[in-house]
Amino acid sequence: LRVGPIFRAPNKDYLLPRILIGLMGLVMLGATIPAYANPTSNPGLINLVDPALSLGETAGAFLGRQLTVILVALIGAVTGLRHLVMIGGFGMAFMNGHDAILMGLVGGPDFRVAAIAGLVFAVLGLLSIVLVWRAPKA
């Protein structure tokens, strides 16, 4: 029976993609949590009106989806598990990419900054996937 220390050394594999995913997750978490109190504070929900703006309808589904992807990404960033980092990167890329495209198509000048930020997050999410695509050599 081999007994090791309670706290192991941190996993240093995939450090750059983990930092990217973690920072994106924290930024998105900072935009998502306040939106539960006021859904119109989130750029993706600003055009909704009642009843779709309630948390039991469209706004709640949007925020729930966003929070789920953020939590998966943050868990991947903390644990360093390759597949969770890739899933988090895909979630960030897909969610931010499609939001950016939709905001760019129907948004207008008010959404330009949010659309550009969404595209940047999508590219960073895809970059994190590419960086962990291959397993590290043992």
Language model features with spans:
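Mid-chain, well-packed structural core segment of small domains
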Residues: 75-105
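Membrane-helix boundary connector in multi-pass membrane proteins
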Residues: 87, 98-116, 133-135
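Hydrophobic alpha-helical transmembrane segments of polytopic
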Residues: 17-27, 62-65, 88-95, 117-124
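Membrane-water interface at the C-terminal end of transmembrane alpha helices
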Residues: 122-138
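Core segments of alpha-helical transmembrane spans in multipass integral membrane proteins
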Residues: 30, 54-77, 90-94
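Cytosolic juxtamembrane helix and N-cap/initiation of the first transmembrane helix
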Residues: 2-28
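Hydrophobic transmembrane helix segments
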Residues: 27-59, 63
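Helix-loop junctions at the membrane-solvent interface of multi-pass transporters
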Residues: 37-38, 76-79, 104-106, 131-135
